[in-house]
Amino acid sequence: ALSLHHQMNGDGKSKNDLNHIERPIRRLLSILGDKPLSDYTRTDANKFKDWLYDETDHALNKSPLSTSSVKRSMDSVNSVFNLANQEHSLKLDNPFAGLRYRKQEPKERPAIPVEHIAQIQGLCQKFDDDMRWLIALISDTGLRLGEAAGLERSHVDLSAEVPHVIVEETDSRRLKTKTSKRRVPLVGVALWAARKALEASLQNNTSFLFPRYNKQASTNSNSASNGLNKWMKEHIPPQYVLHGFRHAMRDRLREVDCPQDVMDEIGGWSKSSVGQTYGQGSSLERLHRYMKKVVI
């Protein structure tokens, strides 16, 4: 069924896209066994769903999946099952469809206060290594962790009139939304971090800015998140995590009266009005003008 899915839907898909389909299928096979589609039952489906919630990657010391992540995994399973069912005219009821999922309160990831941002940025410059470059880059761009950790040399332009990074989909990283594709000016410690990471990448002859998180087919954001958040908790209150820099960037831009359309373009957030979807968007110079104002 998985081979059929790749055969019919694989064209134009990145390795990362295919991995997002393969991973839950391989997990399912390890838990339920490889058997004819007709032999899978509703009990099997619920067993796998519960395993995703409670046991996923415990051996790797990763946290259990959230409901949204479990649903994404089950969507992949449903996609593979439904395609095989349709193409082979099996006329089977899909036991993985319409499952009930646990209700979970969304995790609060508060914006990091400016004083703690300044503290972390100072420590990043003091430690001056690749892990701290990644934190510094995120702190003054508001990039998502996966976006920053997966950057390649070709995504950094320091010679432009406005130095910037390019966020786009690659084989190792897919974008969260269509609006995630963007150019983000480099200011403050983010500019310092990008220079450092680019120099190291050139010296080590690697295409990635942060190769420690790109040793596999896809960017290992989980590894980055665990290590970087652990370090941050040693220096600022534990409720503040890496993603809090992204929330803080939104607040920092508000404080300098940045127009909402510019905020959305900087962060790759969904457009708040239909009108914002027209045209080419703001110039780098316009984005840069507001980002310079938020440097601490």
Task: List each model region and its residues.
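Short, aromatic/basic-rich helix-turn unit that serves as a nucleic-acid recognition element
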Residues: A1-P24, L37
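Conserved tyrosine-mediated DNA breakage-rejoining catalytic core shared by Y-recombinases
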Residues: G150-R195, S273
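Short, charged phosphate-coordinating catalytic segments
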Residues: N82-N94, I138-V162, Q260-V262
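C-terminal catalytic core of tyrosine-transesterase DNA break-rejoin enzymes
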Residues: A136, D140, E147, S223, ...
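Active-site/catalytic core of tyrosine-dependent DNA strand-transfer enzymes
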Residues: T170, V187-P238
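Catalytic-site neighborhood detector that most strongly recognizes the C-terminal catalytic loop/helix
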Residues: K107, A111, L191, K215-Q216, ...
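N-terminal DNA-binding recognition helix of tyrosine site-specific recombinases/integrases
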Residues: P24-R27, K35-Y40, D57-A97, R144-G146
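Basic, Lys/Arg- and aromatic-enriched nucleic-acid-binding interface segment
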Residues: P64-T67, K71-D75, K91, A97-L151, ...
